[in-house]
Amino acid sequence: MQSKGNLGLLMLILTGYLFIFTGSSFGSAYLLEVPVWESNCLSFSFSFLLDNVSMIFVGTVLVISGSVATYCKWYMAEELYYNRFMGLVWLFVLSMVFMILVPNLLMLLIGWDGLGLTSFLLVAYYQNNKSLSAAMLTALTNRIGDVLVLISISIFLSEGGWLIYSYHPVQMWLNLGFMVVFAGMTKSAQMPFCAWLPAAMAAPTPVSSLVHSSTLVTAGVYLVLRSFYIISSNPYVTQVLMILSLFTLVLAGSSAVFAFDLKKVIALSTLSQLSLMMFSISILLPSVAFFHLVTHAVFKALLFLGAGGVIHSNQSIQDIRGLSSLWQGLPVSMGAMSVAIVSLSGAPFMSGFFSKDLMIELSMMDSSVTYGCYLLELLGLIFTSFYSARIVFSVMLGSNYVNNSTLRINEHLNMQTPFLSLYIGAIILGVVLGSKMESFGFVVVLENYESLSVFFIPFAGLILWRGVISKLGSSPWSSAKSLSFFLSMWFMESLTSHPGKVIFFKGSSTVAQSLDQGWLELLGPQGVHAGLGQFSCLNEIVQKNYFTYQLVVWGLLVAGGVSLIIFM
């Protein structure tokens, strides 16, 4: 039974690569549309869009999900609720595939909400305080995006259709672009919605591999890609997206440099790469953003699975200060992490190099990118190389504060097979897609020094690491306040989550005091109760003194009558 399951997952991985290579040479687009409801002014249909973008991305999701499912057989083997966990994982993947294939914004909401619901359940899988708070933060942040998508649907309602890839409005809605962009930013954790992404690391590592490579966080980028016509028609939207994405890039890079949690460092690297994709869309290069989306998904999944092997084999230690010289003990996992880190840094001839190099060179040629924006981009990319070198020299090769055993650890076949399947993509996917897809065939014209600067970026972080690491302990950057600033992502976690909680609780307290405990009580049950009580007290007084009142009145009447008789 287990061999049949492994064979099925292997076929899923091969099918994914078949989709990728077929989609890269796919020149047509097919729209399968089934009418559901029609009227004189409005129609609704269930539709699927099959083009090169959807085929390549579905193939990427299948490759990564098949690899992660195989990996889970080793990583989650001792879990009591393994079947429930895998059911949630497959529901997660199904929601993402549904979102990729559906161009109808109304039906896309099913996959969009499915991702939000299953991510909440997967992040809260371990059912402790940390996991539950992280799941709640993830769910509430994604609710903002859900509301913005619903507002976008209401705007599309006035246009008579919901197809986002062919939006030709009767009336141009300037706010629609902002709605779509900010909805995508909540899912892709761009500033100021970035606090939930590191918190989601409370989920099991295989879930993190799926979330940070090809499902949840990439859903926002994919929505913005599909809505490119809406965004490009409003220059203010692209300018806002450019500024926020560049600041997110620098924020994520600088925070990852000072972070000690291995999974958090990798999560922040995901955030920096997502901001690069958003930046590419903002300068009207959606195909380059998609190119990097695919290559990044593969090598980031490989990096997370390698990190999961390290953590699982070292008694769940995630602090890089407690991990050292693991190359001898975990050669396969370290090899996987090495390939992924080299590709993440944009080293020549790896998948990440082709997409990231193209993105940087085209941004140099774009007149809308100012020198300040370009410097922020370079700074963020240097940070990427810096923390990549930090992982290599600390976890793999270095001797840190804890001396771990250098004995060879048995790496299970279910652990090695996903590494092999993702090795292929991390090494050759960039050159294959770059050579086969016509939309990636840009002509780059740069000066020699500009081209050399792009080539130098992967090594800049290495040089910076070797020069700074010896002085970091005595540097003002290592003070408690500086570390607190960077480890809290520029206090973004407090600024985006704490004020919302304060406003919500104080607002609810005010509403409760003024309405629930105020006017509603005064005019409602308590007011009626008080009024009836006063009336009953008055009635009781009247009833008690009724005979006395009657006797007094009768006496007065008799006295009055007698007086009249006597004096008359």
From Swiss-Prot:
Pfam families noted in UniProt:
NADH5_C, Proton_antipo_M, Proton_antipo_N
The alphabetized UniProt keywords are: Electron transport, Membrane, Mitochondrion, Mitochondrion inner membrane, NAD, Respiratory chain, Translocase, Transmembrane, Transmembrane helix, Transport, Ubiquinone
**What EC number(s) does the entry state?**
7.1.1.2
For this entry, list what GO says about its biological process: ATP synthesis coupled electron transport; electron transport coupled proton transport
Picking any one GO molecular function of the record gives: NADH dehydrogenase (ubiquinone) activity
Family from the record: Belongs to the complex I subunit 5 family.
As for what it does, the entry says: Core subunit of the mitochondrial membrane respiratory chain NADH dehydrogenase (Complex I) that is believed to belong to the minimal assembly required for catalysis. Complex I functions in the transfer of electrons from NADH to the respiratory chain. The immediate electron acceptor for the enzyme is believed to be ubiquinone.
Tell me what this protein is called.
NADH-ubiquinone oxidoreductase chain 5
Q: Which organism is it from?
A: Mytilus edulis (Blue mussel)
Q: What is the lineage of its organism?
A: Eukaryota, Metazoa, Spiralia, Lophotrochozoa, Mollusca
Q: In the UniProt record, what gene is named as encoding this protein?
A: ND5
